[in-house]
């Protein structure tokens, strides 16, 4: 086998390989002979079919298989000999021999991984959120839990904020009905902001059996393009008002949350512990986000291989398609412009290249016990954690997500040891993105 490598660009290479024709013919004949031992043809006993007949029947297929195997094998050997790190898949092309017909020649065009020069992290600054879960945070969570268990009871009085009302409505724009502008027995809780302010405010103070007509101006950026920027006239009839009743924070409420013996203080302690666990996860997520950005910022400019970017684009597109499907949306003709995902795909490929180099240089591969810890943490979100853990370990490919998470944790830990890390006091609501 003879090889030579051509540089076609910063990362693009062409590998030219020539293989003796005799080697291919020998392999084709060897495979045909093996096939003849088991081939069945009418009029011949098994294993007694002449090689010429086997070659006539199976020759083209066997030759094709041999050529493919030779291409792959010799390409792999040539890549090793030339110390090439192939990114993506090569494009194979046969070459017409100019003079020496004793050689089979082909070329493989591909991209290689770029050289990664990691920057100095000593001057990098990272802020670690410092969060204390307060009694007020526990109270806010309790209030959310109470609202999730709210009960409504009919009342004979004008509607006010917090009430659930039942209405029939009909909207007209320029005297004509429009999509979504009509409903019967429609329920909503006043003050939750589900509908436009111009629609909800006139409903306050209405009594059961009362009707009202008013105008609603749709914003120019309203999601319904048919009505965006237009004014509609709504006729509304209110058929019922229900007052909200929140459960008291007592033993019965604690029991409804699964707290043994309805211990209210134990309930508050468990809520606090859950908030602290969630806060710790959010802190780690913010640290990881900063670390990844620091790695991008401190590493010299990287020209990501186009093949890897295309593969990442396909992954992002598939993720988006699955997300749409999980929401019950039709994905038959689903497609997103590549321009929407191009920048994100390039960012992810660059980051992946940096992480790969960092892990290789500093041996940051996760240990089995680290992967196990990630799996067990993921499993806690399910009803039967033990079954979820067993499911992950039943097939190696199911562990890839956990392995990636553990690897990233190792990278974050390593970078935090090198960078300048300062604490930043932060309310829980801000950390959770609620402020």
Swiss-Prot record:
Residues 162-247 form the PPIase FKBP-type domain. Its EC number is 5.2.1.8. Its main location: cytoplasm. GO terms for molecular function: peptidyl-prolyl cis-trans isomerase activity; protein folding chaperone; ribosome binding. It is found in: Cytoplasm. It catalyses: [protein]-peptidylproline (omega=180) = [protein]-peptidylproline (omega=0). One of its GO terms (cellular component) is cytoplasm. It is an enzyme of class 5 (isomerase). GO terms for biological process: 'de novo' cotranslational protein folding; cell division; chaperone-mediated protein folding; protein transport; protein unfolding. Keywords: Cell cycle, Cell division, Chaperone, Cytoplasm, Isomerase, Rotamase. It comes from the Bacteria. The keyword Chaperone applies. Pfam families: FKBP_C, Trigger_C, Trigger_N. Involved in protein export. Acts as a chaperone by maintaining the newly synthesized protein in an open conformation. Functions as a peptidyl-prolyl cis-trans isomerase. PANTHER family: TRIGGER FACTOR CHAPERONE AND PEPTIDYL-PROLYL CIS/TRANS ISOMERASE, TRIGGER FACTOR-LIKE PROTEIN TIG, CHLOROPLASTIC. NCBIfam families: tig. Belongs to the FKBP-type PPIase family. Tig subfamily. Consists of 3 domains; the N-terminus binds the ribosome, the middle domain has PPIase activity, while the C-terminus has intrinsic chaperone activity on its own. This is Trigger factor. It comes from Nitrosospira multiformis (strain ATCC 25196 / NCIMB 11849 / C 71). The lineage of its organism: Bacteria, Pseudomonadati, Pseudomonadota, Betaproteobacteria, Nitrosomonadales.
